[in-house]
């Protein structure tokens, strides 16, 4: 029996006031519908039907490379009509799980509980109890058994008092679902084909109807405008921050941390305020991350420190390495054990060896730097000739004086010393001292120019 997931994603989202389809608006740097797709995969979906309509080109440009069956809903005539568009892709023996592209916080554990609650060939619906159920379809029960769902606009006064509401998420048997969808009518206040009407049909057919509920109501909330989108973002971030704290991270203020990807943390990690963590990030034990730092797709070793306002992107910090404040590690940069870069140092496609240091104001690109090297302030690896990039190699225990330019390709041998202000254009042998400064001149009797008076 295959698990066939149908995701409804055809709506425009007029209240978003955006040309972007509603389901492509992001939560934690990932579209709402992508969150739903990922959750569908995590519960073991065998196939995913994406019902689309508005903004087809934008949807396909964002999601097109994934294993999805694209199902067009040319007219938006209700949720029942939307699901019916996928009928040709639903097998009689399938379990059909219906999800929504604008409900991004639904948890895999909740869906697993829903699927587990479904009896053989039965219908399972996800419900939630709300103190204020205004606007939602109500779950109608008789003798505690579900017999139907009535929408807000069609509900009687007695039914409006019900606080158990329909989330729209359900699991149904494929054969019966297709039959029920074929019987839907638009004879209602909205003039639409309600998916919820299949519940009464299931009851009439004697099908067992069971329910499950999410751990939190926020899981089943959608976003129809940007205020609701922001509320979902905050809920996502609160949940992500809680997960980090349970895994061993100390958060200076959980409300001032943005997590936009998959983060793994070790024990006794300290994260200060206004940090952004994006993509796949691995953080070791006893790591300190300063205020305002940005970490993107990077690996941080044990006992490392990222000082305030540093950016680490597609880069690695080894054990006890440190960066910042105001340092930038660009893609391909790596600090080996106990290496350090300080304020306003930028690295790209470069390795700084064990115990080596670049304290401040340097650019290190396309470079291999050995152990115990000192890079003085203002040092630049001149790696680009206008057409191609070239490599700078600095071997162990080299001292590079301040304001030195290394014109690649060039190799500096072990233990060499480069005098401050030098421009190095050829290889330097092991142990050599190289100075390329112009000889200093002393001009006595020289008078500084005097400014002309303003007219």
From Swiss-Prot:
Keyword presence, Cell wall biogenesis/degradation: yes
Molecular function in Gene Ontology: glucosamine-1-phosphate N-acetyltransferase activity; magnesium ion binding; UDP-N-acetylglucosamine diphosphorylase activity
Entry's cofactor comment: Binds 1 Mg(2+) ion per subunit.
Principal place of residence: cytoplasm
Source organism, top-level taxon: Bacteria
Subcellular location: Cytoplasm
Chain spans, region Pyrophosphorylase: 1-226
UniProt-annotated binding residues for Mg(2+): 102, 224
Annotated region (Linker), positions in chain: 227-247
Binding-site list for UDP-N-acetyl-alpha-D-glucosamine: 8-11, 22, 73, 78-79, 100-102, 137, 151, 166, 224, 330, 348, 363, 374
Cofactor(s) for this UniProt protein: Mg(2+)
A GO BP entry: cell morphogenesis
Keyword presence, DNA damage: no
Pathway: Nucleotide-sugar biosynthesis; UDP-N-acetyl-alpha-D-glucosamine biosynthesis; N-acetyl-alpha-D-glucosamine 1-phosphate from alpha-D-glucosamine 6-phosphate (route II): step 2/2; Nucleotide-sugar biosynthesis; UDP-N-acetyl-alpha-D-glucosamine biosynthesis; UDP-N-acetyl-alpha-D-glucosamine from N-acetyl-alpha-D-glucosamine 1-phosphate: step 1/1; Bacterial outer membrane biogenesis; LPS lipid A biosynthesis
Keyword set, alphabetical order: Acyltransferase, Cell shape, Cell wall biogenesis/degradation, Cytoplasm, Magnesium, Metal-binding, Multifunctional enzyme, Nucleotidyltransferase, Peptidoglycan synthesis, Repeat, Transferase
Similarity remark: In the N-terminal section; belongs to the N-acetylglucosamine-1-phosphate uridyltransferase family.
Name the UniProt record assigns to this protein: Bifunctional protein GlmU
Gene name of the record: glmU
């Amino acid at each position: 029996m295959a698990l066939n997931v149908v995701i409804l994603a055809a709506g425009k989202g007029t209240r978003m006031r955006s040309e972007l389809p509603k389901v492509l608006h992001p939560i934690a740097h990932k579209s709402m519908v992508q969150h739903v797709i990922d959750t569908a995969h995590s519960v073991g979906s065998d196939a995913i039907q994406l019902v689309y309509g508005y903004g087809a080109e934008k949807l396909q440009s964002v999601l097109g490379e994934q294993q999805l069956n694209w199902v067009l809903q040319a007219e938006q005539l209700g949720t029942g009509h939307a699901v019916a568009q996928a009928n040709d892709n639903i097998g009689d023996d399938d379990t059909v799980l219906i999800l929504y592209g604008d409900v991004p916080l639904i948890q895999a554990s909740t869906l697993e509980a829903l699927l587990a609650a479904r009896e053989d060939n039965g219908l399972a619906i996800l419900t939630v109890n709300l103190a204020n159920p205004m606007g939602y379809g109500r779950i109608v029960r008789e003798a505690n058994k579900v017999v139907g769902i009535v929408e807000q606009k069609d509900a009687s006064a007695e039914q409006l008092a019900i606080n158990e509401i329909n989330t729209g998420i359900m699991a149904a048997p494929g054969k019966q679902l297709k039959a029920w969808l074929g019987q839907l009518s638009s004879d209602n206040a909205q003039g639409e084909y309600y998916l919820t009407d299949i519940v009464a049909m299931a009851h009439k057919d004697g099908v067992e109807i069971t329910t499950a509920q999410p751990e939190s109501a926020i899981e089943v909330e959608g976003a129809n405008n940007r205020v609701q989108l922001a509320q979902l973002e905050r809920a996502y971030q609160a949940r992500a921050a809680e997960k980090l704290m349970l895994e061993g991270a100390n958060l200076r203020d959980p409300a001032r941390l943005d997590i936009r990807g998959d983060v793994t943390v070790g024990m006794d990690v300290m994260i200060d305020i206004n940090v952004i963590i994006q993509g796949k990030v691995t953080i070791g034990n006893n790591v300190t991350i300063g205020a305002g730092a940005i970490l993107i797709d990077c690996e941080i070793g044990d006992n490392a420190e990222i000082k305030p306002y540093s950016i680490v992107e597609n880069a690695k910090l080894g054990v006890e390495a440190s960066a910042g404040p105001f340092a930038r590690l660009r893609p391909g940069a790596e600090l080996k054990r106990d290496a350090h870069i300080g304020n306003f140092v930028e690295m790209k496609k470069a390795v700084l060896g064990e115990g080596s240091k670049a304290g401040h104001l340097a650019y290190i690109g396309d470079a291999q730097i050995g152990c115990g090297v000192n890079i003085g302030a203002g040092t630049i690896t001149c790696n680009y000739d206008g057409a191609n990039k070239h490599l700078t190699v600095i071997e162990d225990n080299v001292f590079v004086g301040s304001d030195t330019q290394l014109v690649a390709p060039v190799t500096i041998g072990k233990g060499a010393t480069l005098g401050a202000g030098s421009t190095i254009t050829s290889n330097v042998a092991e142990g050599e001292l190289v100075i390329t400064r112009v000889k200093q001149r002393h001009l006595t009797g020289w008078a500084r120019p005097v400014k002309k008076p303003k007219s």
